[in-house]
Amino acid sequence: MGTVVYQQGFQSQLNEPRALRLRLSSPNPHFSQPFGLALKSHLLDSSHAEDTRNRNDDKAAASPVSDSSGWSSLQSLSSGSSSSTKTTTSSEKESSYYVQRPSSCRALSDQSLALCTENLGSESGSDVTDIDELFSLDVQTKNLGETTTETRTLKSRKRSVSPSDLPPPLTTMRGFQCIQMRPHRENGRLVMTATNAPPRNGCFQADRSNGRLRLSILKDSNEFVENEEETIEPEETEEYEEEEEEEEDEDEDEVMGIENVQVSRRCVQGDRENRGLLNWESFCVATS
């Protein structure tokens, strides 16, 4: 007997090698065996050969199916990859189109179009300006300039007024010496100190009496006025005399009154000496 072994080269490595076993009768018959046993063995061999053939046919039929399934799986994978690439390319195209659309195609609203075509007077001739509007604009600009200058002058005046002049210097109960209050800060507190004010050539003097503030004319005011009159040039004095003569001629019917001015000044406290009445010199007042 002999055995034949063969292996399919075109199949995949997963398939195991297949072997066929055939039993062949020897050319020299053995007459020692009975004829019935020989027939039985021949029948068994033939049946076994048929079974093996059927198995081979089934496996051969199954192999293309397996090959086709393998090819189909590979094709499905390739088709899936191709479809995925197609979907990605299509999505990229859509996204790029969606992104580029606003930059390339922008829809203008009615307001924007109106703004664009509002001042195209060279084409339609509708851009006409009124003279009244131009003058009104000029007036507005002038008013703004005046207001700005006024505000600047007010600020400069506020800066020029020194806060040290307020409150004005006042006289004391003991004498005519003027005292002025000076504020200053010390350790986070406001401290008011009384300082002697420098003498001023003023016509009025401030003093307190009976809980009130009174202004009185200084004694040296007439001398101060006389000194100022002496400094006037002679030409100005002549013109001044001529004007006085003309006024006297016109005011002949007017009456000249003489008034005596007396100011009473007393101390509030009784322990101190009372101040006497001050007799002021009389002066003339002309009324027209």
Curated annotation (Swiss-Prot):
Residues 223-256 have a biased composition (Acidic residues). Pfam families: FAF (PF11250). Residues 48-100, 146-172, 222-261 are annotated as: Disordered. Residues 66-90 have a biased composition (Low complexity). Residues 48-60 have a biased composition (Basic and acidic residues). Disruption phenotype: No visible phenotype; due to the redundancy with other FAF genes. Residues 165-217 form the FAF domain. Expressed in the shoot apex, stamens, young leaves and young siliques, but not in old leaves. Detected in provascular and vascular tissue, but not in the vegetative meristem. In inflorescences, restricted to the vasculature and absent from young flowers, except from anthers. Signal peptide: none annotated. PANTHER family: FANTASTIC FOUR-LIKE PROTEIN (DUF3049), PROTEIN FANTASTIC FOUR 3. Able to repress WUS when constitutively overexpressed, but have no effect on CLV3. Belongs to the fantastic four family. This is Protein FANTASTIC FOUR 3. It comes from Arabidopsis thaliana (Mouse-ear cress). The gene is FAF3.
